[in-house]
Amino acid sequence: MLERGGAIGGSSAGASIQGSFLARGDTSGNTIMVGDVQQGFGFMRNTAIDQHLIARGRQKDLLKVLEDPRKKMRKEFNRAELLGIGIDEDVAIVVKGDQFSIIGKDQGLVLVYDPKSWKKETPDAQKWVTLKKGDQYDLAQRSIIPVPPTKK
């Protein structure tokens, strides 16, 4: 369907399942980031998607997936290639090809975690970039797309 120009959507767990790695996919509860169910639908390749980030204080939770300190991630996932995308409440990402844009309420945020840009000494609070309504991101280049200023 996507290859024919169709669209898919999802919020909360419905957004998380669209990544290749399923964050919070444990059958015993949703607080376990790297659980017994790890395979997402893979509509967004090399991604791990989390939700309700700011509303539930989950800003650092995707670090548990991307760093995998307990080494629970299955070998079919290349952790080094994963990009973390955290979507807060009241916002969504609209993906077209290798780019996405943020839609929703002005106060909603999307956090993007790119382990390829981290150094060993990078503090946890600097391991993501914050995007807001109207911002765009290039998944292939792993970079924010500059948006021209709007005329007033």
Predicted regions and their residues:
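Catalytic nucleophile loop
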Residues: 1-21
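C-terminal and late-domain segments of enzyme folds
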Residues: 22-152
